[in-house]
Amino acid sequence: MNVVILNGPNLDRLGKRQPEIYGSTTLADVELELFRLAGQLGVDVECKQSNYEGELIDWIHCAADAGNPVIINPGGLTHTSVALRDALAEISDGPGFIEVHISNIHAREEFRHHSYLSPIATGVIAGLGTIGYELALRYVVSTLNS
């Protein structure tokens, strides 16, 4: 099984940008831990990050065509992108996707409280830091193996 893990705009800045909110862990650290965990769980993960909405959508289309589940931290696109939601709807109708946020978006500015993606997500993990990615991967593997 292959699980696609996508990170949206500004997540390449983890460990540098607003560490008081997002912590000091880098995206490379997160990906390294996900590769390690995937090996333990017997799955392959494909980690990608882009600051460009269209590139994320292209990757979602590839995941849909391959029948792969997606774990996504859409960053700020969470609150603005109908196009991303439309692409993820195809994943939602198939293997499903988990929406992950490092910070608790509901405890932050009002404009961050709304997600265009949450209503069609299999699940949402927010506010648990970078361990949220690991929890999402464990969930995806457990549901696909059952």
Curated annotation (Swiss-Prot):
Pathway: Metabolic intermediate biosynthesis; chorismate biosynthesis; chorismate from D-erythrose 4-phosphate and phosphoenolpyruvate: step 3/7. It holds the Pfam family DHquinase_II. The active site is at residues 22, 101. The record marks 17 as: Transition state stabilizer. One of its GO terms (biological process) is chorismate biosynthetic process. Substrate binds at residues 73, 79, 86, 102-103, 112. It is an enzyme of class 4 (lyase). It comes from the Bacteria. It catalyses: 3-dehydroquinate = 3-dehydroshikimate + H2O. InterPro entries: DHquinase_II (IPR001874), DHquinase_II_CS (IPR018509), DHquinase_II_sf (IPR036441). Its EC number is 4.2.1.10. Keywords: Amino-acid biosynthesis, Aromatic amino acid biosynthesis, Lyase. Gene3D superfamilies: Dehydroquinase, class II. GO terms for molecular function: 3-dehydroquinate dehydratase activity. Catalyzes a trans-dehydration via an enolate intermediate. PANTHER family: CATABOLIC 3-DEHYDROQUINASE. Belongs to the type-II 3-dehydroquinase family. Homododecamer. This is 3-dehydroquinate dehydratase. It comes from Corynebacterium diphtheriae (strain ATCC 700971 / NCTC 13129 / Biotype gravis).
